[in-house]
Amino acid sequence: MEVVQSSVLGRLLLPVWLWLRARYEYSLLARVLRGIAQAWSRACAGSVLIQFVTREGCLSKAWKDSGLCRILTFLLSIPTILLQKLYGACREAFENSVAARIVFAVVEETPLAVAWLMLVIMVIPFKYWNNAYSFAGFLLCFLLAVASGMRKRNFRLDLAFLGPWIVAFGAMILVAWPLSAYPSLSTRFLLYYVTCMLCVVVIVSTVETWRQLTRLMAFSSLALLVMSLAGLYQRIQGVEVNPSYVDMNLNKGMPGRVWSFYENPNTFAEVLLLLIPVAIAYMLCSKGWLGRFLGFFSAAVGCVAMAMTYSRASWVGLAFAAVVFVVLWNRKLIPFGILAALVVLAILPDTVFNRILTIFNTSDTSTNSRFPLYQAAGEFLQQRPVLGAGLGSDAVRQAIGDLNLFHGKDHFVHCHNIYLQVWCETGLVGVISFVGGILWTFKKGCRAVARATCDPVVRMTILGGAAALMGTMVCGLADYIWNYPRVMLIFWFVCALTLAGIRLAARQDGEETSAPVSE
């Protein structure tokens, strides 16, 4: 506020803002909106949905102290335990060694290494990208995480705050590979999933302060800004209209769709969907003007780039993410959010508005082409519902081709629905554990942000991550968001960021005794 008041623009606009605020405070519009907000709050407080979200289930309560959780945590932490014993036996030698102190200083900054790694991963252009980069990077971060616990007696790689469902999904991934109908086609996809597992375990286990959370959000916002500016530059340079991306009869006059560093406009839009809520959360929780500016500018440019992707499923997902964010943050702002949405609709370019109108138009070639995909996936699941085809879209595509189940005009690539695709790959238990894991994360996040004692930075991190995950799950109803492994990694990075915030919130309430939440 002091920065605004001391600026020339602030001195000019602040009196106008204060005058408008005073007039609005006692206006009829303000009373109507406050009444709507209060009625909404009362309705939500007693709703079945709110009770479901805020109630902690029996499995969730039992997981942390269960024998299975303890055994898995012990097995995963064996290398760290051995290093701790080595440090205890040679403590004096390590403490007196300059080289050892330098190594400890490096490995204990694992969250910073993850932040830099994710920044690089998200901004490498598609033609230079190789999925081996992310696997090698997170394998190195995992080794750093293991070594970082050498001097911390109680440090363990954390599975308790991953929850039973995500752990079960990870187990199903490992099982789905040997049980695959086409193991050779599933091998490389196993590495993609293992990369995501390493990402989640490393972030949840090593983030110990709100400053580390803020740093991860800052680097994510910076990556969002870079890729969004690349998309805007692409639009300025000119993008050729690709008929395979759009129905030219229903979208006349629509320009080419931008894709930035991700080859496909839908893929780029899905990345924006995951990162925009995180950037907004970073803006709202930053303590300095530079962080607030980065969060605001990256989110604003990201929204402009999102419009230029013309990706309808991601638009719907972003709208849903905005609703989730506002409801969790301050339900009284819902009427203002509705007004803001109406204003945005009124000023949208004609091409964007016309694109929105085609969302439920079944004559659209993109929409119409999905029905044969869904039908083929449904028929396959009738034949192999429990085990699925095996990891990866290649195995599913091969299985459906061998059974001659797809009868569309084009060829079968994937199911264009994340729930069907995960079911076809990992079987019934896999899809249940996946959906259960994301809902478990969302529920734990809702419970954490509802506590009055929750740290503001931790709270906003959870809000941004939970909103992004829910929006992406809605987007996944019409698209397979993990078609590109890099997007799958970003999805699990946001999930890990949310879980890390939940862990810090629980630690603050005394549910876990370890390092402090703040520094």
Question: Whereabouts are the PLM-identified features?
Answer:
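Membrane-interface catalytic loops of GT-C/OST-like multi-pass glycosylation enzymes that act
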Residues: 184-188, 265, 310-313, 412-417, ...
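A membrane-periplasm/extracellular boundary helix in multi-pass inner-membrane enzymes
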Residues: 229, 235-238, 326-365, 375-383, ...
